[in-house]
């Protein structure tokens, strides 16, 4: 059974990726769990700010929030990984500020969020290195550049 993706568009931002692009990025990141279900919700800054404030106590809209599901796999037909909330205006602004191709930045954040749903994290240096290495490898498969190549420090709105 393939990936079950629920794409919710609650953003008026221009130049959003297609559902097919989101699906391809998720399938790449979730190769180890191809039979999975997740929701991606695209939001504007007001909703992104509200969610980041409520769940992370941060007073700004971040690029991606991940909400892993807490339902045992054996209770479901398809394992529910969780939800990703992506703030479209933040993604566009970051791509411009960081001089990254917009589609490459979208791909990176979707892959990054999916890896969080799989349990990867970047709280300590060793975990960050493992997660970032995997992100680089997956993005390279798509022909996208290393998203961390120009980073002097941790990106300011990277989501846990």
Swiss-Prot record:
Keyword Metal-binding attached: yes
GO process terms (BP): rRNA processing
Requisite cofactors: Zn(2+)
Cellular localization per UniProt: Cytoplasm
Disulphide connectivity of cysteines: none
GO molecular function, one term: zinc ion binding
EC number: 3.1.-.-
Top-rank taxon, per record: Bacteria
Chain segments annotated as transmembrane: none
Biological role stated in the UniProt entry: Single strand-specific metallo-endoribonuclease involved in late-stage 70S ribosome quality control and in maturation of the 3' terminus of the 16S rRNA.
Protein name listed in UniProt: Endoribonuclease YbeY
Organism in which the protein naturally occurs: Pseudomonas aeruginosa (strain ATCC 15692 / DSM 22644 / CIP 104116 / JCM 14847 / LMG 12228 / 1C / PRS 101 / PAO1)
Top-level taxonomy: Bacteria, Pseudomonadati, Pseudomonadota, Gammaproteobacteria, Pseudomonadales
């Amino acid at each position: 059974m393939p990936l079950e993706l629920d794409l919710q568009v609650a953003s008026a931002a221009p130049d959003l990726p297609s559902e097919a692009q989101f699906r391809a990025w998720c399938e790449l990141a979730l190769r180890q769990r191809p039979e999975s279900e997740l929701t991606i919700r695209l939001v504007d800054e007001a909703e992104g700010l509200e969610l980041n404030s409520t769940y992370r106590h941060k007073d700004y809209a971040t690029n991606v929030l991940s909400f892993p599901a807490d339902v045992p796999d054996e209770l479901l037909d398809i394992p529910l990984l969780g939800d990703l909330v992506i703030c479209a205006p933040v993604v566009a602004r970051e791509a411009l500020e960081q001089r990254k191709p917009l589609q490459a930045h979208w791909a990176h954040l979707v892959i990054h969020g999916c890896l969080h749903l799989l349990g990867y994290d970047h709280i300590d240096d060793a975990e960050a290195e493992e997660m970032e290495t995997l992100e680089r490898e997956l993005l390279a498969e798509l022909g996208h550049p290393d998203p961390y190549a120009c980073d002097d420090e941790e990106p300011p709105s990277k989501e846990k």
